[in-house]
Amino acid sequence: MPVKPRAHIARLQRLRNVDDNRSHYMRLDKNENLTGLPDAVIADFRQFITSDFVTTYPDTSPLYRKLAEQLGLDVTQIYLSSGSDGGIKSVFEAYVEPGDQVLIVSPTYAMYYVYANMFRAELQEAGFDLGLVLPVERVLEKISPQTKLVCIANPNSPTGTVFSRQELTKILRKAEDSGALFLIDEAYYEYYGETALDLIGESKHLLITRTFSKALGLASVRLGFAVGCADIIGNLFKTRPMYEINAFATAF
């Protein structure tokens, strides 16, 4: 008799990446860098590839310090992750109990659906109109004392739509009043140019995730990070694997 997985895991549907070679396709499905990196970047990276670099465990502390300096934050406010996806999963691991309500817009980044089901959350969705219009009031009215987590990709994928700074602030205040955590996924923020990063110092209910995969074109490196108040980041840190990222990611 086969060993049965947990019932909610058995219900999940996930596709395997079975294509042998995707390089000859226009890979618009994952928004990968199709033009490659400058030769100088590759040459600089090769200088890191020594025997010690490959055989020793990664030292993440220099990258933490560098990010803290660039973002104007303390290292205790930053959590490195395997892409922004890894940071998002850590949020669910640290904060979402079975039965908690998680609010997302729809359609949006696919992994929100996966993690909501994986951690047995009750998924709430605020849907777009046919013209890809989503009034912020539609999101606000779905936030309640039962809401544990609100996930907003800004800009949103796949719609490319954005919430303004004023709208994000309204969502944050409603989340605070309801005791919910507000996650803003800024994976595509470089294409929009506006960030909510400066709100981190104002709220203990806000998290922001970013990735090196999109605008920086480093999808294979699997490097991202989450930022928030030290208490929230400390809880994410408790969920990390032995090493948050690999040595190749630290080189960037």
Segments (PLM) and residue ranges:
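N-terminal small-domain helix-loop-helix segment of the aminotransferase-like
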Residues: 2-83, 90
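Short, conserved active-site loop motifs that form the nucleotide-linked donor/cofactor pocket
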Residues: 78, 180, 205-206
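Glycine/small-residue-rich loop that forms an oxyanion/phosphate-binding "nest" at active or ligand-binding sites
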Residues: 83-91, 182-188, 192-193
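PLP-dependent aminotransferase-like
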Residues: 94-152
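Helix C-cap/helix->beta junction micro-motif
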Residues: 119, 177-178, 203
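Active-site phosphate-binding strand-loop segment of PLP-dependent enzymes
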Residues: 130-190
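PLP-dependent aminotransferase class I/II
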Residues: 205-252
